[in-house]
């Protein structure tokens, strides 16, 4: 037997041995699995916190008084002593003017003058090839 055959046989035996060990450690019926993977007692390192919800004191419901308070409008406050007055008058802005009516966005007369409408009835018939 030559050197190459000896190396091939040795390598094959090594691969088979490693495969057997892997299969034996993963199979539950193997003696190596039973010896190395004994069931261990489960130890809990977690703590349990119990939260107790107590009733939050609710305020006594107040019966609504009808009619409710009415809105009295805006009353500007007088400026405080030593503070400058507001640089703008305290009044409402003028109402917006209505938009002026401008020309429509599409004019048929201008659009018709630039290009005639397409009508397939006016197309030239196909020309015969001589």
Curated annotation (Swiss-Prot):
Subcellular localization: Endoplasmic reticulum membrane; Nucleus membrane
Annotated disulfide bonds: none
Residue ranges, annotated region (Disordered): 76-130
UniProt keyword annotations, A-Z: Apoptosis, Endoplasmic reticulum, Membrane, Nucleus, Transmembrane, Transmembrane helix
Protein task: Can induce apoptosis in a caspase-dependent manner and plays a role in p53/TP53-dependent apoptosis.
InterPro entries: Shisa
Comment block on domains: The proline-rich region is required for endoplasmic reticulum localization.
Regions crossing the membrane: 3-23
Name this polypeptide is given: Protein shisa-5
Predominant localisation class: endoplasmic reticulum
Keyword Transmembrane helix: yes
Biased composition regions of type Pro residues, renumbered to the chain: 76-96
Topology versus the membrane: Single-pass type I membrane protein
Protein family: Belongs to the shisa family.
GO cellular component, one term: nuclear envelope
PANTHER family: PROTEIN SHISA-5, SHISA
Gene Ontology biological-process entries: intrinsic apoptotic signaling pathway by p53 class mediator; intrinsic apoptotic signaling pathway in response to DNA damage by p53 class mediator
């Amino acid at each position: 037997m030559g050197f190459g055959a000896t190396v091939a046989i040795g390598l094959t035996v090594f691969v088979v041995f490693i495969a057997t060990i892997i299969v034996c450690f993963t199979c539950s019926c193997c003696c190596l699995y039973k010896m190395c993977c004994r069931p261990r007692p489960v130890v809990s390192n977690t703590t349990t916190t119990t939260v107790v919800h107590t009733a939050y004191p609710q305020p006594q419901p107040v019966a609504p008084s009808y009619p409710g308070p009415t809105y009295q409008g805006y009353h500007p406050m007088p400026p405080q002593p030593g503070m400058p007055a507001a640089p703008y008058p305290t009044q409402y802005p003028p109402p917006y003017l209505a938009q002026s009516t401008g020309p429509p966005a599409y004019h048929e007369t201008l659009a018709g003058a630039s290009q005639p409408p397409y009508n397939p009835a006016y197309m030239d018939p196909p020309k015969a090839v001589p």
